[in-house]
A protein has these predicted regions:
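Transmembrane signal-anchor hairpin modules in multi-pass inner-membrane enzymes, especially those
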Residues: 1-84, 88, 102-122, 168-181, ...
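Alpha-helical transmembrane segments of multi-pass inner-membrane proteins
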Residues: 24, 102-106, 110-142, 149-219, ...
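Membrane-interface micro-motifs in multi-pass membrane enzymes
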Residues: 31-38, 93-97, 147-161, 199-201, ...
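Transmembrane-embedded, aromatic-rich helix segments that form part
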Residues: 36-41, 200-212, 337-342
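Transmembrane alpha-helices of multi-pass inner-membrane enzymes
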Residues: 42-46, 344, 370-419
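A membrane-periplasm/extracellular boundary helix in multi-pass inner-membrane enzymes
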Residues: 196, 217-263, 278-286, 294
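Hydrophobic transmembrane alpha-helices and their immediate junctions
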Residues: 332-375
Length: 419
């Protein structure tokens, strides 16, 4: 009987480790792969809840989780409140929103499994970044991407996976040389694929990642180190600008967009985004409590174009998205939406920040990974509705749940956070 019990728990841990190993790669390689892995992990969590393996601990509530749980349900609640006000109960907005609260059972499962389950992530992040790099092709204008994702999402996913690869070095102790090389290659592949995609909005996160690295990884910052770092950064940018035709082209396009915008041409990529941001603020100021509905921003475009507030081209593109996650939720669901999307970022960010104060090096490093991950998605969402895609919402909520579960794992031998 004991052998059967042991096999059940072992099977659960092996299944969870396998899903953690493959989910980043399936995001690129298989359309719907991320949602498929999410569903399988959720089913595994439900199975364990229904029939808990003997020897596996029950869930022990910690008061820090309350903010995280509320944040994961906030978007769905904001959507429902806005829909009640507008008497429009379309189910579509709840699709992506459901991924947040459905990640809670995943968190509760993983935080009770042994830590070696999470070791799979050390391979998952770099392998996915390298896979995406190898799958990339040049479909339009020399910008590289894949068929299962648009260029912006592809470039941003590659960048975050590359950064996670770099930040995971020595995560569970000193890495062996082959694993360290794999992680460095993952970082290089992710950065190269992001640059080749031309997703310049995501590049805004690079200074943030550098700041996180220096804050947590460098114990002593001298004036000499700062000077050397600045010179190195300028040199690196110059080399990339000269060597990468895509990077060169996208930077020149941005400069041209700004110059022509000052001359009155608002229908550039940058100009249209700026118009839509102002339009979203305008909508929010007129509907501050409940917004215009989760998908009501599109209906505001024609009246605003007729009033001369935005150009017809901006209105046409605005029917698709606002190009900003925060402004989109604020315009669509008012104050409830604004608070909900901020909670999606800052509730887990706060827990990861607390994790960096832990007595355990593993928890500290996991907290740093979480901070880098959430910060990256926050910046990505400033120039595109990154979390509007169901698979992107699934990837974000799933990864946050996984990293938080590693932080709060019951098998750590040291107290989680210093008092």
């Amino acid at each position: 009987m004991g052998m059967v019990q042991s096999r059940y728990l072992s099977l659960v841990e092996k299944a969870a480790a396998l899903l953690l190993l493959i989910y980043p790669t399936l995001t690129f390689a298989v359309k719907g792969g991320m949602n498929g892995v999410f569903l399988l992990m959720l089913l595994l969590a439900i199975a364990v809840w229904a029939v808990r393996p003997p020897g596996m601990n029950t869930v022990k509530w910690q008061h820090e989780w309350k903010a995280y749980f509320l944040a994961m349900g906030a978007i769905a609640a904001a959507i429902f409140i806005s829909q009640i006000y507008h008497q429009n109960y379309d189910a579509h907005p709840h699709d992506a929103a459901s991924r947040y609260w459905l990640a809670i059972p995943v968190f509760l499962l993983l935080q009770r499994l042994r830590l070696n389950v999470f070791a799979a992530l050390q391979f998952a992040f770099p392998v996915a970044a390298i896979t995406g790099f190898l799958l990339a092709r040049n479909p339009v204008g020399g910008r590289s991407g894949i068929g299962t994702l648009d260029l912006i999402h592809f470039g941003n996913f590659e960048l975050i996976l590359g950064v996670l690869s770099l930040f995971s070095i020595d995560w569970f102790g000193r890495d062996h040389l082959p694993l360290r090389i794999l992680k460095i290659l993952g970082f290089a592949a992710g950065l190269a694929a992001s640059l080749a995609s031309g997703s310049r909005g995501g590049w805004l996160a690079i200074p943030v990642f550098i700041a996180i690295f220096f804050y947590f990884k460098v114990t002593r910052v001298s004036l000499k180190m700062v000077a050397v770092s600045l010179v190195s950064a300028i040199l690196a940018i110059t080399i990339v600008y000269s060597a990468s035709s895509t990077f060169h082209q996208r930077v020149n396009e941005l400069a041209n967009d700004v110059a022509t915008f000052d001359q009155g041409n608002r229908d550039t990529s940058t100009g249209i985004r700026w118009q839509l941001y102002k339009a979203a603020v305008d909508v929010f100021m007129r509907h501050p409590v409940f917004g215009v509905g989760p998908e009501g921003f599109a209906a505001e475009m024609k009246p605003m174009a007729d009033a001369g507030k935005i150009t017809p081209k901006a209105a046409e593109l605005g029917r698709g998205e606002v190009h900003n996650d925060i402004l989109s939720k604020a315009a669509g669901m008012g104050m409830f939406g604004l608070l909900a999307i901020l909670a999606i970022y800052f509730a887990p960010l706060n827990l990861f920040w607390r994790a960096t104060r832990s007595a355990s090096e593993k928890i500290k490093r996991t907290g740093i990974l979480g901070i880098a991950f959430v910060s990256g998605f926050f910046v990505f969402g400033l120039t595109v509705e990154f979390l509007n895609l169901t698979m992107a919402a699934a990837f974000y909520s799933f990864t946050v749940a996984v990293l938080l579960a590693a932080c709060y794992n019951i098998h750590h031998g040291e107290p989680f956070i210093k008092p």
